[in-house]
């Protein structure tokens, strides 16, 4: 609900021209120890391609901007060789951990907008956040750090709006009367494939 609400604000121009974004997928110690996640040959990479892509996709979607001009990034393999690591899914085998444990990027878009990308499976941070975004525009900004927060100026004062996106206390349904977001996403994708156009 928060992503769809924020997307509508962005589409309606409520935040103005979006020129800065932050794509965040940071885990403290949540390295997936099953399957081929840790194998560079079979997986292709670590947290950047596993969870970082979701946060980046969300940010690009909010900004409606998919044309990068320049990208600079760094990857780290600083914590993967530790033992007794406090991982949420048990200790990993350092010998089999051949992908990065953290990756960061700086993206400049063709129109000059800038996006910071942060992703990790293992990073010494206090507040992990996964698949969230922050966008800043000329009329306001928004972040998902602790639920959706929209900031703007009203009557010469700084304001923060925290929309109530709950369903009104119905425990078995967390929507707001609109259609399930996964159904909307699938419908948009199918429409794009069938009618040969970019997803909307």
Question: How would you describe each model-predicted region?
Answer:
Residues 47, 51, 103-105, 113:
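Glycine/small-residue-rich pyrophosphate-binding loop that anchors the diphosphate of NDP-sugar donors
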């Amino acid at each position: 609900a928060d992503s769809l609400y924020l997307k509508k604000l962005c589409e309606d121009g409520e935040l103005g021209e979006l020129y800065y974004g932050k794509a965040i997928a940071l885990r403290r110690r949540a390295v997936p120890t099953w399957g081929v996640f840790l194998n560079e040959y079979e997986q292709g990479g670590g947290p950047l391609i596993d969870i970082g892509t979701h946060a980046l996709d969300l940010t690009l979607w909010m900004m409606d901007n998919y044309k990068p001009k320049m990208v600079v990034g760094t990857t780290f393999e600083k914590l993967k060789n530790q033992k007794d690591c406090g991982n949420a899914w048990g200790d990993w085998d350092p010998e089999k951990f051949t992908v990065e444990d953290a990756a960061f990027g700086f993206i400049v878009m063709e129109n000059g907008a800038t996006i910071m990308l942060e992703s990790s499976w293992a990073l010494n941070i206090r507040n992990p956040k996964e698949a969230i975004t922050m966008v800043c525009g000329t009329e306001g900004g928004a972040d998902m750090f602790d639920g959706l927060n929209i900031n703007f100026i009203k009557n010469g004062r700084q304001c923060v709006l925290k929309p109530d996106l709950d369903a009104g206390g119905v425990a078995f349904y967390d929507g707001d009367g609109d259609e399930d977001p996964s159904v909307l996403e699938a419908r948009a994708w199918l429409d794009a494939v069938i009618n040969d156009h970019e997803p909307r």
